[in-house]
């Protein structure tokens, strides 16, 4: 529905294309998580509790490190969770024995959370030298990775906990480059120490989607931070070089169906892959800082060939050889159950936005006990989740 779209979308082409695409601001960060070892295709009966992560030594960290530089560099800095000091010294420690203190958020109103949203939105383009100029896509990736670890069979993982602050989860291959994303959010947390990291990271994902032109995402507060012993095992996030069976294996454990898998894959409208993180290279679309249905249009209408290079298997567009698709992306048009939804979303951005809105809101609440949200029911809009005004909407209202 058109009413779900938000704010102004400023067009700024990423590069010349051989086709007449509607372009929007460009970005360079990878939105998804294709480097963590995961079960192959077809999936095994039981997931591995850990693919490659060994025990790590406790490490002291610098508090409130500045976000900047090589935002997604996969090096030493990415293997350290940068943690700030919350209320009463909470969240000071990093490592396998780290501990956190509870943050009190039930007393805060929608206006308080809107202020947090605004602070995030104001900093999305704070560093024009970072990749293609926006932190938005990497915040979507952070929210995704913090939430997509949920396993409904064991009822573990998910957005409740923000355990990526600690090793070994911070060192999982799928989380390469996200240390700086956490650093970005740490600066926001310093301004609003009352909000839990779990709520902050998911709210950041909401702000990024909306500010980049996507639909309004309903959101509820109530997530609680956890300690390092609650870190999820490696291998719970999708691997980009797999097929449809792997996608179903990963997403079904979270509780998603085929339609929701395709809708959530539409987040690949944003960002790009990097060889020094996932091993893959390039953006999915010509305007990777704009949330649109162009990802699905390209899947359906562009000709894709296997790229000849020294990296892992991926596809490139025939027209310009500047775009890429992963094996998991192509699986969406190779599998009939997935393809029918790709076709729908390619034809109608409104349908895509409506379905993505629901699936993404569901993703951001995975693993959160129902009682956590009940404490906030009196603060919600008539008992309904919050929907936040975009920067453009607030400017137009003044």
Curated annotation (Swiss-Prot):
Query: Its Gene Ontology molecular function terms?
Result: cytochrome-c peroxidase activity; heme binding; metal ion binding; peroxidase activity
Essential cofactor(s): heme b
Localization: Mitochondrion matrix; Mitochondrion intermembrane space
Pfam families for the chain: peroxidase
Feature type site, description Transition state stabilizer: 141
Query: Do you know which InterPro entries this protein is assigned to?
Result: Ccp1-like, Haem_peroxidase, Haem_peroxidase_sf, Peroxidase_I, Peroxidases_AS, Peroxidases_heam-ligand_BS
Tell me the enzyme class: oxidoreductase
Tree of life domain: Eukaryota
Q: What's the protein name?
A: Cytochrome c peroxidase, mitochondrial
Q: Which organism is it from?
A: Mycosarcoma maydis
């Amino acid at each position: 529905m058109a009413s779900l779209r938000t704010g102004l979308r400023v067009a700024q082409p990423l590069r010349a294309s051989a086709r007449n695409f509607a372009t929007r601001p460009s970005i360079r960060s990878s939105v998804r998580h294709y480097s963590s070892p995961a079960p192959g295709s077809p999936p095994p009966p039981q997931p591995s509790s850990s693919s490659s992560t060994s025990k790590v030594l406790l490490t002291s960290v610098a508090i409130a490190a500045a976000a900047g530089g090589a935002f997604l560099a996969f090096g030493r800095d990415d293997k350290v969770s940068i943690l700030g000091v919350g209320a009463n010294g909470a969240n000071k420690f990093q490592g396998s024995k780290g501990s956190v203190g509870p943050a009190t958020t039930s007393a805060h109103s929608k206006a308080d959370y809107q202020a947090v949203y605004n602070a995030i939105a104001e900093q999305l383009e704070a560093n024009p030298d970072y990749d293609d100029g926006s932190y938005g896509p990497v915040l979507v990736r952070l929210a995704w990775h913090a939430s997509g670890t949920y396993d409904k069979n064991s009822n573990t993982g998910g957005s409740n906990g923000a355990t990526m602050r600690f090793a070994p989860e911070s060192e999982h291959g799928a989380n390469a480059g996200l240390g700086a994303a956490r650093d970005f959010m740490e600066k926001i947390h310093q301004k609003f120490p009352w909000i839990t990291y779990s709520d902050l990271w998911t709210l950041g994902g909401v702000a990024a989607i909306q500010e980049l032109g996507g639909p309004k995402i309903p959101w509820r507060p109530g997530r609680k931070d956890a300690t390092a012993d609650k870190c999820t095992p490696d291998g719970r996030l999708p691997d980009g070089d797999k097929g449809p069976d792997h996608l179903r294996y990963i997403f079904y454990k979270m509780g998603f169906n085929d339609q929701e898998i395709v809708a959530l894959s539409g987040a690949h409208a944003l960002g790009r892959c990097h060889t020094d993180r996932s091993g893959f290279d390039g953006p999915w679309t010509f305007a990777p800082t704009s949330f649109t249905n162009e990802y699905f249009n390209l899947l359906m209408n562009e000709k894709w060939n296997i790229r000849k290079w020294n990296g892992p298997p991926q596809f490139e567009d025939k027209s310009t050889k500047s775009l890429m698709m992963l094996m998991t992306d192509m699986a969406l048009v190779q599998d009939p159950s997935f393809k029918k939804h790709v076709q729908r979303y390619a034809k109608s951005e409104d349908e895509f936005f409506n379905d993505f809105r629901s699936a993404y809101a569901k993703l951001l609440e995975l693993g959160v006990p129902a009682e956590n949200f009940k404490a906030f029911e009196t603060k919600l809009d008539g008992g309904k989740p919050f929907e936040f005004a975009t920067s453009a909407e607030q400017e137009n209202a003044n």
